[in-house]
């Protein structure tokens, strides 16, 4: 197993996965058709109701965990409706409420909610994917966001995408996959002076290298 300098991620993968481009091209030529669970349909109805009651743009915070980042993004974008999505009720229950009133936490599977938003022609202005599970084993490429068949939905949702990780290979892969979708991408090192998430705070405190990929339509 290889350990990249200044990261707690251990992996048997030392560069962009050999199968990445083939896998992304396969997903670009097909439509993800996994049935949507009833609770994700209910989550979508909640989001639609929130959008109807709000006049500002939509910002998504997918895989939001405890929602710390959702609240921080809401304070940074007071005119936007910021929706944090996570499948874990336990993580969402640990959210510490803030004075901002323009954000909501939704329990649901992000991929199914993305698909429903696209089907409803609902666009987002910005989309944050902050420290998702990196699935660092080489055999787990298909479990990463950019290796999942729902990945093309991110482009269809529109807006600027921001992915953060403490594993550079992850953001390099995401950038390469996003370029296949026709997005402009930029990968940079990140200085977390005001951490958005609990993970970011932990990694910064441990002096780990942090990376960000920003992607948007050309």
Predicted regions and their residues:
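Conserved beta-strand/loop positions that form the S-adenosyl-L-methionine
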Residues: 62, 85
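S-adenosyl-L-methionine
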Residues: 1-58, 68-76, 96-121
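Conserved SAM/SAH-binding beta-strand->alpha-helix loop
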Residues: 88
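Class I SAM-dependent methyltransferase "Motif I" SAM/SAH-binding loop
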Residues: 63-67
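Charged helix-capping and loop-helix junction motifs
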Residues: 142-150
